[in-house]
């Protein structure tokens, strides 16, 4: 229930069977206790306290640099400042990559309002305890960026960020967290006081129409990352990165996906000063900042990240099994919402099937998520109401959709970043005609036909061609069939041939190929001689 916090769990062996809670008001005062039991427990909190109570292994802090994680550990960058002699987005000296226990800065999600005059009633009359103006900076020319004359102070210069207490918060009990909340509360009020005084903007104050029962101040601290369980699958930087294992546009295909992310690897500072002038790296410099928007592409999150390795009856859709670097992107509310949806579906299926959570078939979870129009692989031009939506999503998870060729896109000299989401590379193009090369991959991988390659038969589909192994597989199965189903153009002496991978495919041709592969009649579309679109082909397969 709202305004209750978990303080312990009920266990039966390695199974979590219930949760013990206490009421907690907005001032942190703990009240009456409550007890809940359930067939499945879902811990969707930032802190993932239930992992601690249930002795479920978890990670906290930062992992060391590795092959899968070149940006892990202690790191200095110039993402938000210029460094003489360094190009933008550069990893700087003294970036040791050493692991530690630290977390990125926490804060409150403060909204402020421009009242247009300095004598408004929400101007702070005195600074909070411990106020130090050297911690802050503010440009008085800053203007409201959200409706109703309001500022998102969370996103302006990271002014409310405070390092050094994140890990302590996560590991603390609820009594100690009250004291930590005060530290952040005073720090963030100090930022607002600075804005109103030395910042030269006395017209700015807390909003009169928000958090009216809490002094117009947010109820909860913003925990950017908490515990991360040890799950059946651990998401790493290489699962998000476009280039480490991806195709230059998106992360690698993860067939067990139950959610997607589309946000850069973004970490606020982990160590360093608060707003003071500082050297670019080393002692006295801010450390831990990451902003890998150019290197991060749309990516997938497997079901195994929600499921503890050795415990039953509980899922973690927020404190998922991942590294610090991966969490720097996953930590967005739309992603956690999708993971929460997946957790709910998995829990319901486990109960209905009378199965352990780790034994629920991922395909069942995916099928239900697709019925609910959840996206499991990202496209810019495949709306949820598209007739081809479910088919394309399923086929994409099987690797049946031909990916883009990076050579076909002008990426040289440009930092595409999140703006690249408008590129053709992220489009499925459901209304465009499908080619034979594309259809060969759609059919072979979509029907999960084992590859069979006897030789390189076609001069226009040589080894190295994107469709090579799929065209050759169609040829091999066709020649073994009593009735050949793959058409090609042989030379007069039958020593070479053309497969025409760029030729459009008709509905009749597609049905003929599918019938041959499945060894049963597949009806052709209503207009068999018309060119088949990519969306129609997906539905047919």
Set out the residue ranges of the language-model regions.
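Residues that flank catalytic or metal-binding motifs in active/ligand-binding sites
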Residues: 2, 15, 102-106, 187, ...
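Flavin (FAD/FMN)-binding glycine-rich loop and adjacent Rossmann-like elements that form
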Residues: 2-6, 13, 18, 22-23, ...
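Short, composition-biased local secondary-structure segments
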Residues: 4-10, 307, 443-446, 525-526
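Conserved beta-strand edge residues that scaffold enzyme active sites
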Residues: 6-7, 65, 409, 488
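A short, hydrophobic/aromatic-rich structural module that often spans a beta strand
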Residues: 11-12, 466
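Feature responds to low-complexity, polar/acidic, surface-exposed segments characteristic
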Residues: 369-393, 401-511, 515-536, 541
């Amino acid at each position: 229930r709202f305004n209750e916090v978990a303080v312990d769990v009920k266990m039966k062996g390695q199974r979590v069977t219930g949760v013990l809670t206490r009421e907690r008001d907005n001032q942190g005062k703990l009240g009456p206790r409550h007890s809940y039991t359930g067939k499945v427990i879902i811990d969707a909190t930032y802190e993932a306290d239930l992992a601690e109570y249930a002795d479920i292994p978890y990670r906290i802090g930062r992992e060391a640099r590795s092959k899968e994680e070149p940006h892990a550990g202690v790191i200095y960058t110039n993402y938000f400042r210029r460094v003489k002699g360094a190009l933008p987005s550069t990893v700087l000296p003294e970036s040791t990559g050493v692991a530690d226990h630290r977390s990125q800065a926490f804060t409150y999600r403060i909204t402020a309002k421009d009242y247009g005059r300095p004598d408004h009633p929400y101007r702070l009359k005195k600074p909070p305890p411990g106020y130090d103006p050297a911690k802050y900076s503010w440009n008085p020319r800053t203007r409201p960026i959200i409706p109703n004359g309001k500022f998102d102070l969370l996103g302006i210069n990271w002014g409310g960020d405070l390092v050094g207490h994140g890990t302590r918060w996560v590991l603390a009990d609820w009594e100690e967290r009250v004291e930590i909340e005060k530290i952040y509360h005073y720090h963030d009020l100090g930022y607002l006081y600075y804005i109103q005084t030395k910042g030269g903007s006395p017209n700015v104050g807390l909003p009169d129409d928000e958090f009216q029962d809490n002094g117009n101040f947010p109820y909860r601290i913003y925990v950017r990352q908490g515990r991360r369980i040890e799950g059946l699958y651990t998401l790493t930087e290489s699962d998000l990165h476009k280039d480490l294992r991806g195709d230059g546009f998106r992360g690698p295909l993860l067939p067990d996906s139950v959610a997607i992310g589309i946000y850069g690897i973004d970490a606020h500072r982990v160590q360093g000063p608060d707003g003071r002038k500082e050297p670019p790296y080393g002692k006295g410099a801010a450390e831990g900042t990451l902003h890998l928007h150019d290197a991060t592409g749309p990516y997938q999150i497997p079901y195994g990240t929600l499921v503890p390795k050795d415990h039953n009856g509980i899922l973690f859709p927020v404190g998922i099994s991942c590294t610090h670097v991966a969490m720097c992107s996953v930590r967005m509310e739309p992603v956690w919402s999708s993971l929460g949806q997946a957790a709910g579906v998995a829990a319901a299926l486990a109960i209905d099937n009378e199965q352990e959570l780790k034994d629920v078939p991922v395909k069942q979870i995916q099928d239900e998520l697709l019925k609910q129009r959840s996206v499991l692989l990202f496209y810019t031009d495949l709306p949820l109401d598209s007739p081809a939506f479910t088919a394309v999503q399923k086929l994409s998870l099987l690797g049946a959709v031909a990916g883009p060729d990076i050579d076909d896109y002008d990426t040289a000299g440009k930092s595409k970043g999140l703006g690249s989401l408008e590129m053709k590379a992220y489009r499925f193009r459901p209304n465009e005609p499908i080619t034979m090369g594309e259809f060969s991959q759609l059919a072979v991988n979509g029907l999960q036909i084992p590859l069979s390659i006897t030789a390189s038969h076609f001069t226009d589909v040589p080894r190295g061609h994107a469709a090579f192994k799929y065209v050759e597989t169609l040829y091999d199965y066709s020649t073994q069939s009593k009735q050949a189903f793959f058409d090609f153009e042989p030379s007069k002496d039958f020593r070479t041939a053309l497969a025409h991978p760029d030729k459009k495919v008709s509905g009749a041709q597609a049905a003929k190929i599918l019938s041959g592969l499945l060894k049963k009649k597949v009806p052709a579309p209503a207009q068999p001689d018309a060119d088949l679109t990519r969306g129609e082909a997906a539905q047919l397969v």
